[in-house]
């Protein structure tokens, strides 16, 4: 299991709120676009309902805030494009490098 430094854990707890708010703001704009389509109103409604059903499970919306999950949560946030590697600049160099190594391995 990956050992998270206290300093990285503190940074993560501070940043996650803003990351999630930004992600949900992006989602809200996309939801508005769905509702404003020139489609059947029922289709727009059900498309939006389906989209929200899937989005509400993403780490960018709801997160398991355990220190032991932080590394995996960061990887999920990157995968979902909630954050970019540049968003990790405040974290320790070791943590950034470990994340980059896994991202490169996963392709």
Please report, for each region that a protein language model flagged, where it lies by residue:
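Acidic, Ser/Pro/Thr-rich low-complexity regulatory regions
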Residues: 1-107
